[in-house]
């Protein structure tokens, strides 16, 4: 029997391969996967081919484990390529949904021949998809925080794409009264996104949330925006000065590399200082706001009485709004 290359000194691989192939037919991918971790090769398919040539076993007509799934891998890579053209991304990862019968046959065979420390077939399938997609697109794989996640469903022969959220920080100025900060959620889905609201979660775009959301939909080709507001105001209030800060989480964005202007006029509100951030801060966000009040009195107030307002500095106060209580503190007070 002629041995070749990496197999010359490993009779154990040869003997185990003979035992396995005498019981069931395997493709080169499934055969090589059982032993590739104990060699210096990176390709299970290549190792499987070497083993088969070494022991003169015929090529399997139908693989016992995968039922020739690997012969169709290129079709799914092409599917990934076609779907990826809609998205801007640098990194990706890929997952797979296999028929349970395939996984069970793989587990059974690995247990039967005591094959320890061997990748399962699902891992091998995703590795093969990833390697081929990298060669086609030159994108980088990232298992922790990929821009795009592909999931290949081999049961339904479909490919699903999910993108990492984009996080933004910005400020808005509102120079017209009558605009609410928040929009009402879609009544059909309660803000989760459905066909009736085009997956936006809201159906009106007349307030601050709606106007900024619509702007971000167009810029990032995103479906839905979740806001974290730094404080709030009612529809009769103005937001002046540097504006009110906010955070936005963009769900399922197709665009990521968007150039953002320093200022954007959205008709009745202005947003500025808009920029990408890594994540939205956790927990309660501390902030200070400046409020201007116009007070009218029946009687004239002397300057001595007005000076007593200074006593409110550093005094905690409670505000009740919509049956919710908020604790505030007056840091500075001016009057004229």
Predicted regions and their residues:
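RNA pseudouridine synthases
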Residues: 1-336
């Amino acid at each position: 029997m002629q041995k070749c290359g990496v197999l010359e000194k490993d009779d154990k691989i040869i003997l185990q391969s003979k035992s396995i192939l005498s019981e069931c037919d395997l493709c080169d991918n499934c055969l090589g996967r059982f032993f590739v971790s104990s060699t210096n090769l990176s390709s299970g398919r290549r190792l499987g081919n070497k083993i088969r040539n070494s022991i003169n076993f015929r090529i399997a007509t139908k693989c016992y484990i995968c039922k020739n799934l690997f012969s169709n891998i290129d079709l799914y890579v092409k599917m990934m390529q076609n779907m990826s053209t809609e998205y801007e991304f640098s990194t990706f990862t890929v997952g797979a949904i296999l028929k349970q019968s395939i996984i069970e046959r793989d587990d059974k065979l690995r247990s039967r021949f005591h094959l320890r420390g061997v990748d399962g077939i699902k891992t091998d399938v995703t590795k093969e998809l990833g390697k081929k997609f990298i060669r086609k697109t030159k994108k980088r794989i990232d298992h922790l925080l990929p821009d795009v996640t592909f999931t290949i469903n081999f049961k339904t022969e479909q490919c699903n794409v999910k993108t990492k959220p984009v996080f933004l920080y910005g400020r808005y100025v509102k120079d017209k009264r009558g605009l609410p900060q928040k929009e009402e959620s879609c009544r059909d889905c309660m803000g989760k996104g459905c066909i009736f609201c085009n997956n936006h979660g809201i159906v009106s775009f007349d307030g601050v949330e709606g106007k900024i959301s619509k702007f971000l939909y167009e810029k990032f080709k995103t479906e839905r925006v979740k806001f974290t507001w730094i404080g709030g105001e009612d529809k009769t209030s103005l937001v002046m000065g540097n504006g009110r800060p906010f955070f936005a989480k963009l769900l399922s964005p197709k665009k990521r590399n968007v150039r953002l202007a320093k200022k954007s006029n959205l008709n009745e509100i202005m947003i500025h200082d808009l920029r990408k951030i890594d994540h939205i801060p956790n927990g309660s966000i501390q902030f200070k706001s400046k409020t201007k009040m116009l007070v009218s009195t029946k009687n004239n107030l002397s300057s001595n009485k007005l000076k007593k307002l200074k006593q409110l500095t550093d005094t905690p106060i409670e505000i009740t709004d919509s049956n919710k209580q908020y604790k505030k503190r007056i840091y500075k007070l001016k009057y004229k």
